């Protein structure tokens, strides 16, 4: 049901928002928080009827009152006369005037720049900066101030600033929340990503599966644009993504998009595990996605399946026929041998995963890839993960939006609708989205546009606040906040021996409290792929006798990834040790710093009980812990609320002196009580 904001209805009825809010609460028992709150159209119509009835009775009562009212409300007449094609611009102007009359402005985020608040207050930058200076805040035009400061500043200009209520914001997940009970769910097709080393036959394998020749049309044998395909086996569909390879797979995961159900790792039988194969394994483990190994090129003379299985064990992947749980399927893209076995294994794995979705709800999913086409405008390949998408539907995609003008399947045919696990290419977006952006279907385009605008504003705010990834220097703080549970590392070195040495040494540092996990180890310079993996896994990159290339440096600065390089292995290990020592939970010990005997008690009505005490041992310190001991039994434990020497506040009072004190939240002090003062000292851990 459509809604209307309070200030808009007030303007339409020619009454103040305050009057309308009172009317809503008293006449209709509708609670609204402020003029930005939204109410149902049904309630709005009832109010209009009520007020129109009142107006008629007032007209019959006294015509002079009506003339006087009209004189007092010239806006109503001007509004009625000016309803025309220029309505949008004038509404905007009247809305602003309405807000000004009430002296209320709003802000949607936690902070606002001096420039923005000056514009909202309609004051010069100099005036606002001057007021801030008088409040003890030195700020430039582009500097941000928090809500509390903005509130005080607005009050100086006789204005009120309100933070837009979170309940009023259109939360997309709530808008699109559908019933996902078991009865609504239906089985869906598995979504497969193909990964592996270059030239190991990923595209040829996809080609063999689709039973069509596409490899020959590609430049240099490298995948240019395959996108996503759906194939069928025994009446069951399987969706394949080639995005291409693990770079885009991780880029999407870094943006929070987990689209893949199963990964097919292609390994050449005559080549074995190669650097990109290692990277692919690391990515799968980091994403916690099931993996099926397709041992390709078994028709080659030098093929050695057992050697590949042996090499896989070094990365924790033990084949099923070797007693492990990794499915390994020997295949040949050239002779089509083993293709059906591979597809059967995919379907078997998907059955175990119990993949389900609700096709009878609003669609949602992920952008696989997107581009700007000269003739067609923004084009996006979407993977529908839930619901059904139709031509004409309005969607919000990341920080862009649109209405679907046309939709094509993986074979390039024009289609009207698509269900879960279906890849489609769509036209009609306002801008080009990014791979990994999530899309949601909305009721109307206006809603989608509103959400997209809010997201753009949020992205801008996040950029200004410059949030950073994990670094060795701030690991302790992040552990304390509970944002980091383990230390993830990516190790690169000049030779494989150094990689293994570092991995073993670093993983041995793991304790019950702090876990060190080497996400990926490889030989060669630190590249952009390493930075992407670190971004997705919130990890740190360690380089031994290697340096990051230019692209990696740019990416690390952009994404806030910490890169550390060393020439001595010992230095790397010591740095990690130091970071982990900081990460360990601190231990504390109690240190009694003094005792005092209560000699006299004073009861003051406005303050409570004050004890006059004599320091027997050590000293008493303000804000230190305090125990009240009576006849050798601890009867209360808190802290010293106040400590005085004569009439003056004292930070501490030493042995042999008298003092006045009070205990936080305790008034039952009696003469003869012993006050034991203590502090908690941290015991710093020096070793793991």
UniProtKB/Swiss-Prot annotation:
GTP binds at residues 196-203, 242-246, 296-299. GO terms for cellular component: cytosol. Coiled coil: none annotated. Residues 53-62, 86-95 have a biased composition (Basic and acidic residues). Residues 221-225 are annotated as: G2. Residues 296-299 are annotated as: G4. Keywords: Cytoplasm, GTP-binding, Initiation factor, Nucleotide-binding, Protein biosynthesis. It comes from the Bacteria. This is Translation initiation factor IF-2. It comes from Clostridium botulinum (strain Loch Maree / Type A3). The lineage of its organism: Bacteria, Bacillati, Bacillota, Clostridia, Eubacteriales.
